[in-house]
Structure formats: C-alpha cells, structure tokens
C-alpha cells in the first residue's frame, strides 16, 4: 500500500503555479491574465490556487513574503534583554540569507514585458507596510515603548525602506548580481 497522499506535493504545486503565472504574464501581461488561466496552465483547481495565494498579486513577490514571515518569527524569538538594533540587523540578514541570486521575482526584472509596474508598486506598498509593522513591534518590545511611538515608527520605516531599496537594486543588477544579503547589509548601513 502506498503512503503517498493524493495530489501534487505542496511545494511542487506552489512552484508550478508560480511558473505558470510567470509564463502567462510574459505571454499576455499581468492585467490580461486571469486566475482561472493560471490554474489551468498549472494543472490545478481554482481552489488549489487559493490554498497557496490569497490574490493574484501574491504571485509577483516570490521569496519576499516568506522572508517577511521568517523575519517575524525570528524577531519574536529574540531575547528582550538583547540590544535592539544589532539584533534587528542580524535577524534581517538571516531572513534573506537563503534567497539565491536566481530567485529574483520576474515581476521586478520584467515589469515592462509583464505589465506589472503598477501592481508591483501597489502590492509592494502592502509588503513594505507589513515589514515595517513587524519591525516596529519588535523595536517597541525591545525598548519597552508603544508600537506607535514616533521614534519606533521612524526607525521601523527607515529600516523597511532600506530593505525595499536593497531588493530593488538587487533585482535590477542583472546577471552580475550578488547575494541579496549583501545589498541588504549595505542598505542597512545607510540607516
């Protein structure tokens, strides 16, 4: 008797959906591609699509959402007695360390062809804000202040902005790009 569960393995289905979407965005543009077309190309149901992605725009970000999730989990695990900023820097760098040079979201490198420029700006802002919220919660906890404290919010948004700048420069660096963590480290040095 086989112990294999029915259906595709979860990681394969997610990757298949991402690949199918990228192909369709390149062929038809982002705006002209429907979720039903993506599911059909990937060979999955519409329900399966929504098991992995809450919205079509989630397909644009590849590793970024997972990196924010890792950052949130790791920041919660930091000892409250540790100095906030060095711990924040180390945790951010650890969260992006496994993102290889081959994992650049196509939506960022192929914005014109895919027609994703407006959507990456819009959905990117959501990710920027989520990351800033995660960082603000950490800083507030470490410093014993309110999460809406001006200094906490200023630091959190400066750091989130630096990370966004690093992602942008990394994505646009082309075939000569270095690991993302190098760009993030340089951007964090600037703030």
Residue ranges and their predicted role:
Residues 118-143, 150-157:
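Amphipathic alpha-helical packing segments from all-alpha helical-bundle domains
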Residues 69-110:
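Hydrophobic alpha-helical connector segments
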Residues 47:
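Key DNA-contact positions within bacterial/archaeal DNA-binding proteins
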Residues 17, 55-60, 70-71:
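Short amphipathic alpha-helical segment with a characteristic S/N-K-E followed by hydrophobic residues
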Residues 106, 137, 148-170, 182-191:
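Hydrophobic alpha-helical segments that form the core
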Residues 1-28, 32-44:
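Basic, helix-initiating cap at the start of DNA-binding domains
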Residues 99-102, 142, 166-174:
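Secondary-structure edge/capping motif, primarily at the C-terminal ends of alpha-helices
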Residues 4, 28-30, 50-62:
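HTH DNA-binding helix-turn interface
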